[in-house]
Amino acid sequence: TLADHPVETLGPTVVVDGKTFVFTSDSGPGWDFADAAPEIDLALADASHLSAFEGGSIPHMSAREAAVRARDAGVKRLVLTHLVPGSDPEAHRAEAEAAYGGPVEVALPGCTFTI
């Protein structure tokens, strides 16, 4: 799926054994999970910044924007990635959980996720 990003960027969708994984890659608020797949078991979503920076010149989703889009598309499990270095992963997680309505994880170096 073509990402919402000034530089052409693809967000891959992988389906294995009936389970669907979607990675938004670098993507802005125009990303729509429904364009990637009708049912998503695990989404790894760009969440570079917090909602305080929405609407600015940063071409990436906030934690809240990623969560709202995932919630609206019925994504079963949401993992945030591409956080700005030095930012607080727990602040991103908390903001996303408030919008998503369920648990959200943050991908940190060395993390692995099983679908």
Write out the residue ranges for each language-model feature.
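Cap/insert and terminal regions of metallo-dependent hydrolase folds
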Residues: P29-T112
